[in-house]
């Protein structure tokens, strides 16, 4: 009987040790998985930010000083201010600093106080043309290759001489010989303002432009 009790006590110690080891292993695995996920998210964020930085100031064939706004270009809802204004393409890359209240560039109010904001303006590196590059017989003066203009985007119509910034919902600048932008291509306009959003866990966020049902608006992503 005594031997049985001793064996049971020893078994309890062994089982308790095994359970403790299992709990410790589980905790270690959970922590490792969390850090791995954080590392993966960090690498993805750096990849996106690096790509946007490489394209800062790229507006197709045109240089920023040669780009003008179309007369029908609508204002952006909740636009940023100063050099950070969405359609101020000449200031295509700069760094601002949030104040002590977490406010910056007129459109950010939730940044980590005294943190940096990186503003990047460019076009998507994918030209849209009237098909002439692929088929000399398809020269209609209408952007249709590889797709038509979307009514919920903003574009830069550009050639090597000049460019026009316009809403996709409006009539596009003419691209025929003698037109607004002769032999021009359309490029989707992009705006990013990267910053660290304040909170229990600060996170990398960005302001972009997106169609809100009535026009282009600055939103948080």
Predicted region positions:
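N-terminal pilin/flagellin-like segments and related low-complexity appendage regions
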Residues: 45-221
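Aliphatic-rich helix starts adjacent to a transmembrane/signal segment
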Residues: 1-2, 6-56
């Amino acid at each position: 009987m005594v031997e049985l009790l001793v064996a049971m006590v020893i078994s309890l110690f062994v089982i308790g040790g095994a359970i403790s080891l299992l709990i410790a292993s589980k905790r270690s695995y959970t922590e490792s998985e969390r850090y791995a996920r954080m590392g993966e998210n960090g690498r993805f964020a750096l990849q996106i930010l690096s790509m946007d930085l490489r394209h800062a100031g790229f507006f197709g064939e045109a240089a920023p000083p040669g780009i003008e706004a179309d007369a029908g270009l609508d204002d952006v809802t909740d636009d940023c201010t100063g050099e950070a204004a969405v359609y101020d393409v000449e200031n295509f890359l700069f760094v601002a600093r949030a104040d002590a209240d977490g406010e910056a560039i007129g459109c950010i109010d939730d940044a980590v106080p005294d943190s940096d904001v990186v503003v990047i303006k460019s076009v998507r590196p994918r030209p849209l043309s009237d098909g002439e590059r692929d088929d000399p017989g398809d020269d209609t003066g209408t952007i249709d290759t590889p797709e038509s203009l979307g009514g919920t985007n903003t574009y830069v119509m550009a050639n090597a001489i000049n460019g026009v910034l316009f809403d996709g919902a409006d009539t596009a600048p003419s691209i025929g010989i003698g037109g607004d932008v002769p032999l021009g291509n359309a490029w989707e306009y992009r705006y990013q303002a990267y910053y660290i959003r304040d909170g229990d866990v600060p996170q990398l966020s960005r302001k972009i432009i997106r169609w809100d049902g009535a026009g282009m608006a600055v939103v948080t992503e």
